[in-house]
């Protein structure tokens, strides 16, 4: 909130706090507004809007609807079927109207009564919507990835910090005890000196048999608006279908729209944990080199196999791989089908994934982190952490300054694969060293009339 401006919750508190007028005449204030009978008063509720309510966005909507201190006031989606499904769910929860439906996210963001939003849209829309949300003073729960380029991610960071809004990146593994504990084992040298981090990520998929020629737009879908800032391409159903439509969201594996498994489709999650354990949330690697396999035919053209090595200034190596490659590189990955983050020290190792943690020696699994050792921030619920920070104005467990560093690594990996050579990176200046070709890949043009 900008200085000198009263927000909605403060206004409601002031109204309730002055229920007796200047002449001593009592205003009539409903008991629910004062929190009677255990009800959360409106002054303590976070009013939310939801931008993107398909598969993942709809999941967020269901969760936030369950919080008594959240009021869902608006939903927005380009597809009518998603909008109607979402608003019907909200109205069932609240027993009637009170939730408005939008097709244009800008109209939702212009509402002064909305405190916070979720941003759960195709990757190439993230930066535009995130920056507009920040300009409108909206706190945001923002799904990964941060942006379609390193330059756009920095622009999101600048907007969030300039407008002082609360930001939670959708890397919910930071709110999982297993991941925090594994990182604390590494940070406190319980495995000895950390020297290598291996990351196993879900790969992208291929779609050689999917049509990449124009097909009729059977559902009257506004394809031009959906494309937005992305390069023009002929419409096909598969290009822009989503999981909520009962099919795989193929756009996730098209390089004009996403980095696929290397980035927002999965890689951001384990890379984020690698950064946390390495103590490098405010920086990044200094060298990057790797190879990958990129499909030559069909719609999908994000890397399906990759192995990218990063060297940090502290001497730690981080190797980001798809699951198939991870299984070949380290036998520990066979414990979990190639997924997870493996921390290797000179006295032991720990491997962690969402449903799994293992270590050697086994005594590490019951190790105690002492009071004078490194204790990482604790959150047991990523969405609740966001709501509590909206209220307290404190920093979330994964703020934008952390998010941009993780997101950057995924883009560095993609650039290294496509250039096929070693790259030197300056994490302070956030640019490649003496490499004009690589630096040109730090940004992507946007299709007119869209711009940041």
Annotated model-derived regions:
Residues 14-42, 300-301, 388-452:
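C-terminal helix-rich "cap/oligomerization" subdomain common to oxidoreductases
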Residues 53-60, 344, 350-425:
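C-terminal structured subdomain/cap of oxidoreductase catalytic cores
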Residues 224-316:
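Rossmann-like dinucleotide-binding domain that binds NAD(P)(H)
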């Amino acid at each position: 909130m900008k200085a000198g401006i009263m927000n909605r919750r403060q206004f409601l508190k002031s109204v309730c706090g002055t229920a007796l007028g200047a002449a001593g005449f009592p205003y009539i204030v409903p008991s629910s507004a004062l929190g009677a009978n255990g009800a959360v008063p409106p002054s303590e509720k976070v009013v939310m809007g939801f931008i993107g309510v398909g598969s993942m966005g709809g999941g967020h909507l269901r969760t936030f609807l369950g919080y008594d201190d959240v009021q869902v006031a608006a939903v927005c989606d380009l597809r009518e079927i998603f909008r109607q499904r979402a608003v019907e769910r909200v109205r069932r929860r609240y027993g009637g109207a009170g939730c408005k439906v939008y097709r244009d996210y800008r109209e939702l963001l212009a509402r002064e009564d909305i405190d916070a939003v979720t941003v759960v849209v195709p990757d190439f829309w993230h930066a535009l919507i995130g920056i507009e949300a920040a300009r409108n003073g909206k706190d945001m729960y923002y799904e990964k990835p941060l942006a379609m380029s390193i330059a756009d991610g920095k622009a999101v960071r600048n907007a969030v910090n300039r407008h002082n809004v609360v930001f939670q990146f959708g890397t919910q593994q930071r709110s999982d005890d297993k991941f925090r504990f594994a990182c604390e084992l590494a940070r406190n040298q319980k495995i000895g000196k950390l020297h290598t981090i291996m990351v196993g990520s879900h790969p992208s998929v291929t779609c050689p048999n999917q049509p990449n020629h124009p097909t009729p737009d059977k559902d009257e879908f506004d394809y031009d608006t959906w494309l937005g800032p992305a390069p023009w391409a002929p419409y096909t159903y598969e290009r822009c279908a989503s999981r909520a439509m009962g099919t795989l969201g193929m756009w996730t594996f098209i390089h004009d729209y996403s980095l696929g498994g290397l980035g927002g489709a999965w890689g951001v999650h384990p890379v984020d944990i690698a950064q946390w354990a390495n103590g490098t949330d405010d920086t990044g690697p200094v060298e990057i080199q790797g190879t990958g396999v990129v499909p030559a035919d069909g719609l999908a053209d994000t890397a399906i196999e990759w192995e990218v090595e990063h060297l940090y200034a502290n001497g730690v190596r981080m190797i980001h791989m798809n699951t198939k490659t991870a299984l070949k590189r380290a036998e520990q990955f066979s414990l979990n089908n190639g997924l997870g983050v493996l921390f290797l020290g000179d006295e032991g190792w720990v491997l962690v994934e969402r449903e799994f943690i293992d270590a050697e020696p086994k005594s590490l699994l019951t190790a105690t982190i002492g009071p004078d050792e490194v204790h990482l921030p604790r959150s047991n619920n990523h969405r609740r952490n966001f709501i509590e920070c909206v209220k307290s104005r404190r920093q979330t467990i994964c703020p934008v300054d952390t998010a941009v560093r993780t997101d950057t690594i995924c883009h560095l990996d993609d650039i290294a694969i496509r250039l096929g050579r070693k790259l030197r990176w300056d994490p302070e200046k956030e640019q490649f060293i003496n490499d004009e070709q690589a630096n040109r890949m730090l940004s992507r043009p946007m299709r007119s009339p869209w711009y940041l």
